[in-house]
From Swiss-Prot:
This is NADPH-dependent 7-cyano-7-deazaguanine reductase. One of its GO terms (biological process) is queuosine biosynthetic process. Keywords: Cytoplasm, NADP, Oxidoreductase, Queuosine biosynthesis. InterPro entries: GTP-CH-I_C/QueF, NADPH_dep_7-cyano-7-deazaG_red, QueF, QueF_N, QueF_type2.
Length: 274
């Protein structure tokens, strides 16, 4: 299915009963082909979705709420278009379920089917909300740099590394990522963390490269994969991980993670802007 056939940018009828058919899958392959990603993938990872507007009825008709987190493997053939995800979650609101476990099972079944891979789903109930803390991405901030930036279309020529110098291990972060929805043109705001081992990457060039996404159109997952492959090709690090946390829209935030080496799942603590 193509994005132009999705619910994005169209008049919406909100379902009042649970409806799994509202989920709109979009194949990953098309966007990957555009940036030269084929099989085998040069990375693995996860897309972490947090859903803050989930509610259903219990068996006695009383509304229940939870925050749902979805872990979608990067190896899945499809992503789910975000507005369709919102409409799907909204369809739970007037539907009775026996328990939170029954809701979680339905979410796992439906989203896994849409993505074409097994998706992990976790529900945080109100009793657990106090445990959900805010935090910022760890790393040296690129935003401290005082520099000129005038290029707002993706330009990987900014990416350079000093291959004559000793390898380093660095974690770099910036809050200046902005891209745009390819269907509606709405801005997507995010923070990105880049961890690598290899020749030192020029910090100013890396920040200018991230800033160059400002007029770029692409879904969150596609932007992170473009960042990953551009850095991998231009700077040739031995190890590379890219993790972005995008601000919420429609009750959902999307946080893609890509890496080429084994490591623990990144922390899902939301940032202040989320």
């Amino acid at each position: 299915m193509n994005p132009e056939h999705s619910p994005l940018g169209k008049a919406t009828v909100y379902a009042n009963q649970y409806d799994a058919s509202l989920l709109f899958p979009i194949p990953r392959a098309g966007a990957r082909e555009q940036i030269g990603i084929g099989a085998p993938l040069p990375f693995f990872g996860t897309d972490i979705w947090n859903a803050y507007e989930l509610s259903w009825l219990n068996a006695r008709g009383k509304p229940q709420i939870a925050i749902a987190t979805f872990y979608v493997p990067a190896e899945s053939p499809n992503i789910v278009e975000s507005k369709s995800f919102k409409l799907y979650l909204g369809s739970f609101a007037q539907t009775a379920f026996e328990s939170a476990d029954a809701v979680r099972d339905a979410l796992k079944r439906d989203v896994s089917a849409a993505c074409g891979a097994s998706v992990t789903v976790r529900l945080a109930t109100p009793a657990e909300f106090r445990k959900l803390q805010m935090d910022e991405l760890d790393g040296l901030s690129l935003d401290r740099l005082d520099l000129d930036a005038h290029v707002y279309e993706t330009d990987p020529s900014f990416l350079t590394a000093s291959h004559g110098e000793a390898p380093v291990e660095e974690t770099l972060v910036t809050d200046l990522l902005k891209s745009n929805c390819p269907v509606t043109g709405q801005p997507d705001w995010g923070s990105v963390q880049i961890h690598y081992v290899g020749a030192p990457i020029d910090h100013a060039g890396l920040l200018r490269y991230i800033i160059s996404f400002r007029n770029h159109t692409g879904f969150h997952e596609q932007c992170v994969e473009r960042i990953f492959v551009d850095i991998l090709r231009a700077c040739q690090p031995v190890k590379l991980a890219v993790y972005a946390r995008y601000t919420r829209r429609g009750g959902l935030d999307i946080n893609p993670f890509r890496t080429n080496y084994n490591q623990p799942m990144p922390d899902n603590a939301r940032t202040a802007r989320q």
